[in-house]
Every structure is written in C-alpha cells, then in structure tokens.
Amino acid sequence: MKFLITGGAGYIGSTICSALEDAGHTPVILDSLITGRVEFTRNRIFYHGDIADTALVERLFSEHPDIYATVHCAALIVVPESVSSPYEYYQDNVSKSVEFFYTLQRLGYKRVVFSSSAALYDVVPDFMVTEEAPIKPISPYARTKFMMEMVLKDFCSAYGMKGIALRYFNPIGADPQMRSGIHVPVPTHVLGKLVDTAQGRQAVFEITGNEWPTRDGTGIRDYIHVWDLAQAHVKAMVDFGQVFERAGSPADGYLVINLGTGSGVTVLELVQAFEKVYGQEINKRFAPPRPGDVAGSFASADRAREWLHWKAELPIELGIADALKW
C-alpha cells in the first residue's frame, strides 16, 4: 500500500516512513525542508514543496493515484517559539493545513491521520488524561493543534472525509536502525537537552519548575519511544477501515486516540534514568518554568489498545540509549 506523509523529512515523519517500509509499504513524502532533513528522504519518493501549493499536491496525486491515506505531520512544533512567533504558527499549522485538507477532499483522498498533541489537554488532578478529558491549550502551538482537530472534524462531517487525530505525548529516542532521529541544532525538548549536556554542547541541564503538584515537584510526562509512535501510525493507516469499525463507526467519521505509554514519569525521574543509562551524573539545576509550560500529564492508553490494537512496548531506557547513540 502507498501512503502520503507530509513532513516526512522530519523526526517523526521520517520514522513513520521507515516503519511503513519495514512493513512492506511505500511512503510518498511531501516536505518543504524548512525544518526537515533532505537525507531522511533518500531512496524514497519525495516532493519538495509546501502543503498549501495546490498545483504540487494535485501533481503528486496524479502521479500516485493509488495513495490510500494521508498522514499529516507537517507543522512547526516548538512551544516557546510559538509564544514569540504566533503568526508563523497559525499560518503554517492552521491556514496551510486548511488549504491542504480541502485539496485532499476535492481530489477524493478522504482518509486522513492527523498528528495532534497531548499539549492541548487541561491539567487533571491525577495527571492521567483520557480522550474525553477537558481541553485547555495554553500555547499558540497547542491551540493550532486543537484548531486543526476541529477543522478536520468539521470536514469529516461536511465532506464525507474520515479522520483520525492521534494525540502524541512525549516522543523520545530514534529509529532503532539509526536511519533518522532528532535533528535540530538546538533542541528544546528535554531528552535532547540531556544529551547535549552529557556531550558537552550545553553547560548545564535546567529542570524547569520544581514546585508542580507532582510526587517530586517536577513536571510529569509520558515519554514514548518514537518507534512505538511510528508503529501506531502504521496500524492507523493500514487498518484504517477496521479502526473505525472497532470504534463503532461514528456518524461524524472522526476519531481521537491518545498515543502514550499509559504511565507518567517526572522530569527528575527521567534525569535519573538518563544518568543511569549514560553511566555518570550530569550538571543540572532547577529553573523557573518556561512560557507555556504546564505540570503535565500522561495518557490513558486504553482506546489505542482497543481501536488500533497497539500498545507502547519499548522502555524509556531504550529511548535514552537510542537518543545517545543517534
């Protein structure tokens, strides 16, 4: 089977491409390379351009009319940057995605898997969020993801599309075969900063916030190996129709599924696990929370297990080891 992956030259998109290939499928990549890496497209079908370039999208589908479903990963994803540069985030993540979704439905390619985020959840007392948990996106980045979920849901209702929004928790690690991994020069995510600190590119690792209402005062997250995350996308794409059947075939043609491990790890616990894998302590200190930070959450993973027939299997230590190796 053949699938379109927007943002397929990025960290998560490229890992999804590898997982598809390993399962015997063919990814077609559409990526602007503004943040993606051209080497992640090597030996793959690749279209260099923008998701809002209607002529390019039309040409892509005319040359690959057998595309079964689309995974929409293309987006800007840095929370603090979204606070300081909201225009770019709403332009890229919302305006262009609306155009892209409309082009998909106009061309008759109506199966969409959308890369959403757990960042749009409100904090709940026990930190475990189901897909029905209250929504409270507090950063422009999180709001763009929520807006696009609503757009996709409305398009499914109005135009007969079918959409699956996968709400990611905190991806870590790299492709276990080292075909791709995190590639930003200055990482903003916690594990990238730990690696940079361990390898001397960063002087000290800052634990942002130690007065959150968690068991040790540091933020709580659900760290999921990016390879597990990619496998969930393969399930969503290849078994697209069956996923809807398992979900009871909702009339609006739209599903939301959390992708996480189902267990919470605090930032301090992650640091301790990192030091154990790395074999020595790193320089660290507590610092105030960043703009847009929240105490955090972890996934209720029941729906993913029931509808996707998927669960996370790789331990946090492997995610750390793969990140260090990468």
Task: List the predicted regions and their residue ranges.
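Short regulatory "switch" loops immediately downstream of catalytic or recognition motifs
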Residues: 55-60, 173-176, 236-246
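Glycine-rich, flexible loop/turn motifs
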Residues: 37, 79, 125, 131, ...
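Mobile, glycine-enriched helix-loop/loop "lid" segments at the mouths of ligand-binding/catalytic clefts
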Residues: 175-176, 180-206
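Short-chain dehydrogenase/reductase
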Residues: 90, 138-146, 180-188, 192, ...
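N-terminal Rossmann-like NAD(P)+-binding domain of SDR-like oxidoreductases, especially those catalyzing
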Residues: 1-174
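Short capping/connector residues at structural and topological boundaries
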Residues: 84, 125-126, 134, 140, ...
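C-terminal substrate-binding subdomain of Rossmann-fold SDR/epimerase-dehydratase oxidoreductases
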Residues: 193, 199-326
